[in-house]
Amino acid sequence: MNTRHFSQLPKPYLAYPKVIQGLIFKKPKGEKVLPQVEYVVDTLNIDSKHLESYNEICGFKNDGFVPAIYLAVLSQSLQMHMMTSEAFPFAILGLVHIRNQIKQTRKIAVNEQITLSCKFGELQPHDKGLQFDFITTAKVGGEVVMESLTTYLSRQKTEKKASEKSKESKEPAYQPKAEWNISENTGRRYALISGDFNLIHIHAVTAKAFGFKQAIAHGMWSKAKALASIELPAAYEADVWFKLPMYLPSTVEFLT
């Protein structure tokens, strides 16, 4: 596996021109293979002002610690550059974020120096195409403090039919915990912080071009909002499947 080292986190917007090129130059047909490469930011110092802005929009406290999901969001910049700089087999526009797993082994202080790495995981068949993973790891002095698995779907023509879902399903006895009034500009505000300017999140006009009636919230924002709404232990795991869109604006009932 090839490893590419960075002295600082690469800017996500520098990859956008190559994303646009993907609309013009189509990916070659044939067998899909993920690049065997790992991108590593050797020394990542947390920008406290940026973290405060992230905490504000997601609802986390400014308590001197870094939410594990924040590091997963930072790794999306590495993911973007991996998809645009390597022999990535799929068109980036149109990828669907379907899952995110996070594991935090202990609390991470804002002033700790972090080594952040990201590599491609497995490529697997999906009933709507092919899915693949990004594996992100954060270390402090060689100690793993955070791991994240991000799964995307690339829609492809497939002969495999979707498995039939059982009609009998018991829902857990959730209790209402909070009601969120999510404003229309949430997607734009979060994009300025996360660097994820996917058009489905920015405005109703651009979202409609992709088949949505309104702009929808970022999945990683909604996950962060949920995590910020509960008391988390020092070590935990959070596994989320993104099933349905959260339209902007909207009122959402949060259950636990």
Language-model segments: what does each one mean?
Residues 1-34, 95, 101-182, 245-255:
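HotDog/MaoC-like acyl-thioester-processing domains
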Residues 1-99, 162-233:
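Hot-dog-fold acyl-thioester-processing enzymes
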Residues 41, 147, 235-237:
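Hydrophobic residues on conserved beta-strands that form the core of alpha/beta folds
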Residues 97, 103-105, 211, 237, ...:
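A structural connector/turn signal
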Residues 226-256:
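A conserved acidic, glycine/proline-rich C-terminal tail/linker
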